């Protein structure tokens, strides 16, 4: 297969998007709004951070229990 045949689909991906012709509507069919960065949802932020802290504490606690169990089973303690 010729290299130019392989590069043709890649060049299509890199080409700029074509705008619709005059008879088609140029208006977007989807409404896109800006995210509300100036006014964060503090309930969601608190829930996310609380969940993260809980999972890290649980992970470290479980790890320490696993280490103690490993030492007990192998006679290291």
Curated annotation (Swiss-Prot):
Stated role:
Accessory subunit of the mitochondrial membrane respiratory chain NADH dehydrogenase (Complex I), that is believed not to be involved in catalysis. Complex I functions in the transfer of electrons from NADH to the respiratory chain. The immediate electron acceptor for the enzyme is believed to be ubiquinone.
Kindly list the GO CC terms recorded for this protein.
Answer: mitochondrial inner membrane; respiratory chain complex I
Spell out the subcellular localization from the entry. Mitochondrion inner membrane
Claim: Electron transport is one of the keywords in the record: yes
- PANTHER family, per database record: NADH DEHYDROGENASE [UBIQUINONE] 1 SUBUNIT C1, MITOCHONDRIAL, NADH-UBIQUINONE OXIDOREDUCTASE KFYI SUBUNIT
UniProt record similarity statement? Belongs to the complex I NDUFC1 subunit family.
- Bilayer disposition of the protein: Single-pass membrane protein
Name-wise, this protein is: NADH dehydrogenase [ubiquinone] 1 subunit C1, mitochondrial
Instruction: For this UniProt record, give its keywords in alphabetical order, as a comma-separated list.
Output: Electron transport, Membrane, Mitochondrion, Mitochondrion inner membrane, Respiratory chain, Transit peptide, Transmembrane, Transmembrane helix, Transport
Transmembrane annotation, as ranges: 42-60
| Annotated signal peptide | none
| Assembly notes | Complex I is composed of 45 different subunits.
Which species is this UniProt entry from?
Answer: Pongo pygmaeus (Bornean orangutan)
One short Pfam name that applies is: NADH_dh_m_C1
Superkingdom, natural source: Eukaryota
């Amino acid at each position: 297969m010729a290299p130019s045949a392989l590069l043709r689909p890649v060049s299509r991906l890199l080409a700029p998007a074509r705008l619709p012709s005059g008879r088609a509507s140029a208006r977007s069919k989807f409404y896109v709004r800006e995210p509300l960065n100036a006014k964060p949802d503090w309930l969601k932020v608190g829930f996310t951070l609380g969940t993260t802290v809980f999972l890290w504490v649980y992970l470290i606690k479980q790890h320490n229990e696993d280490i103690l169990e490993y030492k007990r089973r192998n006679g290291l303690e």
